[in-house]
UniProtKB/Swiss-Prot annotation:
Gene it is expressed from: Kif9
Keywords (A to Z) from UniProt: ATP-binding, Cell projection, Cilium, Coiled coil, Cytoplasm, Cytoskeleton, Flagellum, Microtubule, Motor protein, Nucleotide-binding, Phosphoprotein
Region (Disordered): 482-521, 547-577
Source species: Mus musculus
Protein name, UniProt field: Kinesin-like protein KIF9
Family from the record: Belongs to the TRAFAC class myosin-kinesin ATPase superfamily. Kinesin family.
Tissue distribution of the protein: Highly expressed in the testis (at protein level). Weakly expressed in the brain, thymus, lung and heart.
Gene3D superfamilies: Kinesin motor domain
Entry binding sites for ATP: R12, V13, R14, G93, Q94, T95, G96, A97, G98, K99, T100
Record function comment: Essential for normal male fertility and for progressive motility of spermatozoa.
CDD domains: KISc_KIF9_like
BP GO terms, sorted: extracellular matrix disassembly; microtubule-based movement; organelle disassembly; regulation of flagellated sperm motility; regulation of podosome assembly
Length: 790
């Protein structure tokens, strides 16, 4: 592309039964809108009120379907993104004018999906059509609410909570949101799941203009990286598509917003005002400065407004006479956006690994050409590889003979040999300087003229060796450790460089220690693997691994025991979850609960040992400091007395010698205790992870047991044998998911089954159903944990 182009601006009119035909007229080419207002007679005879406006656009979408909107607005920008061009699609307009519907659409109906899900679908369809390229797709979802940044995908299980607030960072590659999670997606369904997850976390509120009004700006970004599968070229292309759903502007005097809605509207209007200022500055060719940093919105979109990307604006307006003032304001913004010019360019980068391989091939080819050139010049046995130690020693010998005069000249072979000759000249010169200095030191005592302390010491005691030869030199300073309360629980698990297998090995060497049995990974499906088995005093790693294999071979904990068959019948009314949880821990979950308690007791024992070790370390540190003070006192006392042997060496007494030995032993104890503390901390982190996983398993098993025991539909109960118990696996998971479903849920299942839209809608509906099921499960778990705390 490479040429400058204008930003494309489209207008979409919200359908209404009360369309102002007399005031709003469309051009014949469907690329202009004319607005006509009647003069207000209340202003008198002299009335200079403007009554006519005309706006030139790239297209007017009136009564247009979602398919037509996407084909007109976004399809070209998305297809060019796979060729390496960045793209930005933005929806702007009044509150309730249809921005979110245009961008996201209705997630309940496949036909009514918006630009965003259609763009995801097009990306993965085009990837399938390009088998010669390996294309990686990542997505992120950013929300800007009241000038604060939020990650809409931070609620996913594998995304940890952010410790520091999110910030906008600029680097040579563009704008980077520090703290924003970016998720790899290899399938269309995974991308839809992330979209629905973010939509669930968006902030919406009821408004006079819209019952479900978006109260924040949202930016969904699709990152793409394409490598060639056939070519060995180190060059590859990257691109990103920013899909921006802006919050709606409003006139506070007309909407009458109050309280929190008023505060939100103030922030929204302020950020949109700064956005318009940035657009005006970009459209003015004489402006050198563009105020991007005035708001989080403009700063986050700095590399997406103009620049080297394809930009498309969709302005959503009302067609009613009552909203004509806001419609004019939105159309002015669209006309100003059309003044902004962009210069799209392909984003090319270079793969360092492939570049190294290509350079190695080129180097080998150049060596072959050089060998041919040497053979044609009758030069044989010329080596251009890096020199080894033997060749360097030979050059060093030639340099020495040249300096001594026994060698007249040094033959020049190649550039590498010339560089090494100069290097050996430097080495020989340095060695000669050291030899001269050593000879002077043997004959004279060298003292720095600026070292007044050394001069005074020599004058005082008459020593030739100003440094002296003392027994036991002081080493580096150590540090102390604070003792944390035993009951304190860390808010976040610290990172450790040790793997679980390393932690197990280190703890197995401790005498009398109880170590967690660990395989390659902790298997949540087999809860028996999470049990912490104490090891014998002289046990080794092989015995522990044998125990682990025996433990892992145990059948699942839930068995068809006679006790379950003889249980009392369940009451007709389901008990509360708190009572049912206690019953579950005594019956079905007794084994899981026992393992959980054992793991927790071993974790507490490790924490107690760590606290005791910390106290011992602090005591040893205090004793080391006291011993150092005593040793320094003895040294100063000895230096004052000035006791020396005939050779000029200082003499230390027995008391000072014992202090030196004691200090050495204390430091050894300190190192051993500190190493033990590090091992204990690693074990504590590993045990804490096992306890958390065991707790999660216990709650998950309880939820399944509760639904199977008290929430089974009547037709499933009739199908079961009389008096038999309900075990996991007897009830299909689809029936468990449907427990307590209402008419809307049944309609959703029917909608997914029938799929009138065709096979392309399968991934869309699957992602929607999975996201809804996950959020329902999370709500159930939160309610259960709250009732358990009470």
């Amino acid at each position: 592309m490479g040429t400058r182009k204008k930003v494309q601006a489209f207008v979409r009119v919200r359908p209404t039964d009360d369309f102002a035909h007399e005031m709003i007229k469309y051009g014949e080419d469907n690329k202009s809108i004319d607005i006509h207002l009647k003069k207000d007679t209340r202003r008198g005879v002299v009335n200079n009120q403007q009554t006519d406006w005309s706006f030139k656009l790239d297209g007017v979408l009136h009564n247009a379907s979602q398919d037509l909107v996407y084909e007109t607005v976004a399809k070209d920008a998305v297809s060019q993104a796979l060729d390496g061009y960045n793209g930005t699609i933005m929806c702007y307009g009044q509150t309730g004018a249809g921005k979110t519907y245009t961008m996201t659409g209705a997630t309940e109906n496949y036909k009514h999906r918006g630009i965003l899900p259609r763009a995801l679908q097009q990306v993965f369809r085009m990837i399938e059509e390009r088998p010669t390229h390996a294309i990686t797709v990542r997505v992120s979802y950013l929300e800007i609410y009241n000038e604060n940044l939020f990650d809409l995908l931070s609620t996913l299980p594998y995304v940890g909570p952010s410790v520091t607030p999110m910030t906008i960072v600029e680097n040579p590659q563009g704008i980077f949101i520090k703290g924003l999670s970016v998720h790899l997606t290899s399938q269309e369904e995974d991308a839809f799941s992330l979209l629905f997850e973010g939509e669930t976390n968006r902030i919406i509120a009821s408004h006079t203009m819209n019952k479900n009004s978006s109260r924040s700006h949202c930016i969904f970004t699709i990152y793409m990286e394409a490598h060639s599968r056939t070519l060995s070229d180190e060059k590859y292309i990257t691109s990103k598509i920013n899909l921006v759903d802006l919050a709606g502007s409003e006139r506070l005097s007309k909407t009458g917003s109050e309280g929190r809605v008023l505060k939100e509207a103030t922030y929204i209007n302020k950020s949109l005002s700064f956005l318009e200022q940035a657009i005006i500055a970009l459209g003015d060719q004489n402006r050198d400065h563009v105020p991007f940093r005035q708001s989080k919105l403009t700063h986050a979109l700095k590399d997406s407004l103009g620049g080297n990307c394809n930009m498309v604006l969709v302005t959503n307006i009302y067609g009613e006479a009552a909203q004509l003032d806001e419609t004019l304001s939105s159309l002015r913004f669209a006309s100003r956006m059309k003044l902004v010019t962009t210069e799209p360019a392909i984003n090319e980068k270079y793969d360092a690994e492939r570049m190294v391989k290509n350079l190695e091939k080129e180097l080998a080819l150049l060596k072959q050409e050089l060998a041919i050139h040497d053979s044609l010049s009758n030069r044989t046995l010329v080596n251009y590889d890096p020199m080894d130690e033997i060749q360097i020693a030979e050059i060093n010998s030639q340099v020495r003979r040249y300096l001594e005069g026994t060698l007249d000249e040094i033959d020049i072979i190649n550039l590498r040999q010339i560089q090494e000759v100069f290097n050996q000249f430097r080495v020989v010169l340095s060695q000669q300087e050291q030899e001269v200095e050593s000879a002077l030191r043997r004959k004279y005592t060298l003292i720095d003229k600026n070292d007044f302390a050394a001069i005074s010491a020599v004058q005082k005691v008459g020593l030739m060796d100003i440094e002296g030869n003392l027994v036991g030199e002081p080493d580096g300073q150590s540090f102390g450790l604070g003792v944390a309360p035993f009951s304190v629980k860390p808010g976040k698990k610290p990172k450790t460089k040790k793997t679980p297998k390393d932690q197990f090995s280190s703890s197995a060497r401790k005498e009398g220690a109880s170590s967690p049995v660990s395989g390659k990974d902790f298997d949540v499906a087999s809860i028996s693997k999470t049990q912490l088995i104490p090891s014998s005093k002289d046990g080794d790693l092989k015995d522990m691994l044998a125990r682990e294999r025996e433990t892992s071979s145990i059948e699942p904990l839930i068995s068809d025991s006679p006790k379950e068959e003889l249980r009392a019948p369940r009451p007709s009314t389901p008990p509360s979850r708190t009572v049912a949880f206690e019953e579950f821990k005594n019956e079905r979950g007794s084994e899981i609960n026992r393992i959980f308690k054992e793991n927790k007791s071993i974790l507490n024992e490790r924490k107690k040992r760590a606290s005791e070790t910390t106290q011992r370390i602090n005591a040893i540190k205090q004793e080391i400091d006291e011993t150092k003070d005593a040793l320094n006192f003895q040294k100063s006392l000895r230096e004052k007395q000035g006791e020396y042997e005939n050779k000029g060496l200082m003499i230390i007494d027995e008391e000072e010698f014992l202090l030196i030995l004691k200090l050495k032993d204390l430091k050894k104890q300190y190192r051993n205790e500190y190493q033990e503390l590090r091992d204990l901390r690693a074990e504590i982190q590993y045990c804490q992870r096992l306890v958390d996983q065991c707790r999660h398993r216990l709650l998950m098993e309880f939820d399944i047991w509760y639904n199977e025991s008290f929430m089974i539909p009547e037709d499933v109960q009739v199908a079961l044998k009389l008096g038999s118990s309900i075990r996991p696996g007897m009830v299909p998971i689809s029936r468990i998911v449907c427990l307590g479903e209402d008419d809307q849920d049944r309609f959703s299942h029917l909608q997914q089954t029938v799929l009138p839209e065709g096979l392309d809608s399968i991934t869309f509906y699957n992602a929607k159903v999975k996201t809804d099921q996950k959020h329902n499960y999370m709500k159930t778990m939160v309610g259960l944990q709250q009732s358990h705390r009470k």
